Amino acid sequence: MSLLSDLINLNLSETTDKIIAEYIWIGGSGLDMRSKARTLPGPVSDPSQLPKWNYDGSSTGQAPGEDSEVILYPQAIFRDPFRRGSNILVICDAYTPAGEPIPTNKRHAAAKVFSHPDVVAEVPWYGIEQEYTLLQKEVNWPVGWPIGGFPGPQGPYYCGIGADKAFGRDIVDAHYKACLYAGVNISGINGEVMPGQWEFQVGPSVGISAGDEVWVARYILERITEIAGVVLSFDPKPIKGDWNGAGAHTNYSTKTMREDGGYEVIKKAIDKLGLRHKEHIAAYGEGNERRLTGRHETADINTFLWGVANRGASIRVGRDTEKEGKGYFEDRRPASNMDPYVVTSMIADTTILWKP
């Protein structure tokens, strides 16, 4: 195994200028991630320098067998924490040979929203709190839980330490450092209320980069869980009963919200979000009705409610924002399995572009 490890960690720069680019895309479910690698003649610093590529869409549920070619357009580059050196991870979106975005390509529509002059002028910032659950591979049951049984009630696990309270920290810390190495604007991690559940935060990130960074952070996390022999779940309610679900709370502000008088802008934006509550819920992740019950720090899925420091609301405004009269708010409705391109662009569209 030591020879295998040595080969995996070979420093290519000592013998060649060539690099490895891992092209990453979203598969047919809209949540599964796929990737494959190719050799390039030398280091690359911008996606525009990368060639387009293709893959067999009939094997990912994204194209019929008789016309299976799907084209990958490179969109964002990150350093590769697995191969290191000058090797890169490449976030791509997917198109038909005719240049039309395929149905699971949500980035294309999001990029249109974020390139609108009114949105560009507002410099939208996002901070996304991505919750997830680590599962034992053979039994599909949270790590640290007795097989077929349950741990003690919730309470000691949130931000907890100790072998009886924190399960999977080695994966979490490896992911944290790998994201920092890759150039992801990861801002923190913490253990969650349900044991075996964790959270990482990405942001503040501007516009389309928020979606790119969440997707590559998810990719890095699943690669690490693959190495650890653990299953990664983004199910919004992985365990029935008196256990917290998993969300992707999305913190948001615009330039005018961050300036003096911004609190009034925030309140108007929240009013607009309330008017489109059903449309947002429909786009905020599958199975969210199992999570948004009005319990476990959620608002009921059919009710739109906002408040200051209220974690049982749809939208939470922080006390600092209220006190300073400017800042940001948190949309607590998105599920952990949401598409960040959809959620971020929809919030921008509703609060900046949409006219009720």
Swiss-Prot record:
Coiled coil: none annotated. The keyword DNA-binding does not apply. SMART domains: Gln-synt_C. Residues 19-99 form the GS beta-grasp domain. Residues 37-64 are annotated as: Disordered. Its main location: cytoplasm. GO terms for cellular component: cytoplasm. The keyword S-adenosyl-L-methionine does not apply. Gene3D superfamilies: Glutamine synthetase, N-terminal domain (3.10.20.70), Glutamine synthetase/guanido kinase, catalytic domain (3.30.590.10). Its EC number is 6.3.1.2. One of its GO terms (molecular function) is glutamine synthetase activity. It holds the Pfam family Gln-synt_C. Keywords: ATP-binding, Cytoplasm, Ligase, Nucleotide-binding. It is an enzyme of class 6 (ligase). It is found in: Cytoplasm. Residues 106-356 form the GS catalytic domain. GO terms for biological process: glutamine biosynthetic process. It comes from the Eukaryota. PANTHER family: GLUTAMINE SYNTHETASE (PTHR20852), GLUTAMINE SYNTHETASE CYTOSOLIC ISOZYME 1-1 (PTHR20852:SF93). Belongs to the glutamine synthetase family. Homooctamer. This is Glutamine synthetase cytosolic isozyme.
